[in-house]
Amino acid sequence: MISDLDQFCAQYGCTPSLRIEAPGRVNLIGEHIDYLGGCVMPIAIEPKITLLVAPESNGGKIELWSAEQEDTKYKISPKDFTPKTIPEEHWLNYAIGVMGAYAEQGVMTPGCRVGIFSTLPAGAGLSSSAALETAFALLIEELSGQSCSILERALRCQRDEHEWVGVPCGIMDQLSVGAGLKNHALLIDCQEQSIKPVRLPKGLNLVVADSGVKHALADGEYRERRQACEAALEILHENSWRNISLESVLKNQDVLGDRLFKRARHAVTEMQRVNEFSDALINNQIPKMAQLMQDSHNSLRDDFEVSCPELDVLVDAGFAFGVEKGHAGSRMTGAGFGGSTIHLVHESIASSFIEHLRSRYQKAFGRELNCFITQASDGARLQPLNTLKPAL
């Protein structure tokens, strides 16, 4: 297999001087509540997006090339930093959006040549978009000499999603990609914008299963869920979901109506589940963790209505394996409408667990399941400039 470094050299005829890596993420629990000011528990994972960069004084032009689109190279300049330059859902929008977000703060992207490489499947709910945004943010900061905090970087990348891509996302993905810590989950308070690392129990592996259903968050369903929660909050006469109890939601069921009631019930119960899951994780209470993950998935399926048959089959298969055999929890991860499931399993049974998932998935849908084992990873990072050498 040709290395990414050799591919870059063949494409551009020069050697890069900078390598940037940004991981994907899974979320253990706390779905669709980051944009409601709740707490979430994501993990940065090993699959990642890599940028190789060669600074150039080519009139300020920025050349972008993705290894997944070998025949296409893009040349852009600061005047191109306007929302929706090209069709929605194109990866270039994320890159241009980050450059635009920094330009709004007076930080311009110097001319450079960029090669983009990925081991993250796009549309699998693993935050490939946030990884790409964060990688480009680090690129801009390194080349411009103007760095910022992990939080400010995440906020600029979030602005990219809102204004350039059209997805009203919360802050979880960008923060988890930027602040990931090896062997730890991150307890992120999205209202206070604070991060507390929580060490994962030794001996647990993360199994990620791609449902094969690609999700597209800019198509309106994600926005509808957020708008429904905002409407429910207004009906409940509160300014924060942190102030609302399940009792209050139940009391106002008739006023909310069926759809808003279900959205509100998910919001308040998911916030409570995150608090309980954090305590269970710290105290290594595996059965409690598994139950909370199952309750979370059921709520996303029934109340928030963002699951799909493929996700449900994978989660059910996980719990059918049995906690007594080393299974510690399963749920959909990410915004839903397809994407992936996350499974916590003991490292000694990870391989047999994957075969179990593949068998159940094949039987249900007649196609092969793509899944992999991963670990909690460090967040986005730069590689020292003098360590990059092409193969001889």
Give, region by region, the residue ranges found by the protein language model.
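Gly/Ser-rich oxyanion-binding loop with an adjacent helix/lid
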Residues: 1-20, 27-30, 35, 39, ...
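C-terminal nucleotide
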Residues: 1-25, 50, 54-88, 187-329, ...
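Short Gly/aromatic-enriched secondary-structure transition segments
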Residues: 37-44, 225-226
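Short, amphipathic alpha-helical segments that act as regulatory/interfacial helices
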Residues: 45, 99, 103, 230-233
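A structural signal for short, well-ordered beta-strand segments
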Residues: 114-116, 209-211, 341
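FabD-like malonyl-/acyl-CoA
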Residues: 130-131, 340-344
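Glycine-rich phosphate-binding loop
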Residues: 337
